[in-house]
Amino acid sequence: MCSIMGYCDCCAAFSDFEEGFKKTVSRGPDDSRIIDTGKGLLGFHRLAIMGLTPDGMQPFELDGSYVVCNGEIYGYEKIKEELAKKYTFKSGSDCEILLPLYREYGVDMFKMLDAEFALIIYDGEEKKYIAARDPIGIRPLYYGYDKKGVIMFASEAKNLVGMCGHVMPFPPGHYYKDGEFVQYCDIAAVDEVCHDDLETVCKNIREKLIAGVDKRLVADAKVGFLLSGGLDSSLVCAIAARQSKKPIRTFAIGMSEDAIDLKYAKEVADYIGSYHTEVIMTKEQVLDSLEGVIRMLGTFDITTIRASMGMYLLCKWIHENTDIRVLLTGEISDELFGYKYTDFAPSAEEFQKESQKRIRELHMYDVLRADRCISVNSLEARVPFGDLDFVKYVMSVDPAKKMNTYGKGKYLLRHAFEGDYLPHDILFREKAAFSDAVGHSMVDYLKEYAEGLYTEEEFKEKCEKYTHAKPFTKESLLYREIFEKYYPGQSEMIVDFWMPNKSWEGCDVNDPSARVLSNYGESGK
């Protein structure tokens, strides 16, 4: 995944910078470098995925300007071919095009990128720093100010805690220049609603998702797939299996007692002919990993933490037992096509508003989870449902078509792939939350553990000291206390707990799990 960090002033304390930067070395264990630009420091931990030679090591330099980028730029070859008329390239790295691109187009370059990225540029001519993040926030970036008021940027909040008083996520779809954050893209906004008929919409969804998977299979390192047996990851794997000349490698995880996902994942793996691995996790592993997972994530959010337990342990197994470096996942489908709770949306307009809210906040929840669970194990996450062309198109589709008006949630996505991509029962399987589907017992163990830590009086007393995102269950209090241990006073990095829209009838619940909704039905079976 790589890790980047920047201190934007000439009076940097190198040892403090180095100490903060070391905290994310697992994101890029292949090589590390910190350089003094003359006006500050830039750091880079490398995980080599594209252009595996030493020439691909960052920071890249061009006439006194520098760039560090944690990113994947799709279709960079065409851009590089055009730039090669004026510039010389030394490596096969996709990120080497960034400085020539900046030289030609300035900050307008960010609108041109089909990429997931976080970057910091030092402009040697203007003697100033520019930072930017992709429109969804798939690649992480945080910022804060030190005691002297100097801005710092880093891949994770843990790099900056202790150096900056207040750490915040860098807003997706923005760049920073001259002391201001400027929005260059609002991926959730819709300029013109698409009123194509159902079959045309589904055809476009199919073609655009296939293209999104296709471009994410390109890597100089080995690629694998997380397969839960749910609709989203199963589609990614099925598409990839068709594109690959040999069996793809798929991985699934579940509790030893009651893993719902494992049987469905195996059914998909058998159907698409993948080389499939099942990993079993135990109650002891879950509880032993909890504090480390919260420290890794940098969140107190209940559903993010629950869903991270299985994902973290699975990625840990992959890191320790295979030579795979890249993992494709199924995140971002729910935000586009709907959750179980969006069945309760009172109107098409409300459905669309909720989808836009979820897309704009993704970087604090599911995208954060996937990034941290995968990167802490020195792997790279790629998210086909986050393909910019795909997201823009689905967001533009008439929301009346995206609502559950066909008797099945995510009907457009399911109908788009009817045929022989997946077994019918998988394609039309009811949604189950990942944290539930790895085994209902996992969430029950976490709740039970938290319940045993506090009396009712202690619970009420401890909750009172929190004003932002106040804990409301013993489980949420436990997570908050662990979070505060490693990120003291930084709770505003997360806007609030991820919960269904409580203003909708049927959604005023006290737990983020879809299990508590009246329409959960057969999802957990």
Segments from the language model and where they lie:
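N-terminal glutamine amidotransferase
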Residues: M1-V68, E72, L101-D196, K203-D214, ...
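ATP-dependent adenylate-handling active sites, centered on carboxylate activation for C-N bond formation
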Residues: C8-F14, K85, E104, E125-I130, ...
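A short, aromatic/hydrophobic, helix- or strand-capping loop or linear motif
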Residues: R27-I35, K90-C95, L141, T405-K410
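Structural signal for conserved beta-strand scaffold positions within catalytic alpha/beta enzyme cores
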Residues: F44, S91, Q183-D186, A252, ...
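Short, polar/flexible loop-turn hinges at active-site or ligand-entry regions and domain interfaces
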Residues: L83-G92, V107-M109, L160-V167, F300-I302, ...
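Acidic-aromatic/histidine active-site loop/patch
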Residues: L98
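Conserved S-adenosyl-L-methionine
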Residues: Y184-C185, P423-A432
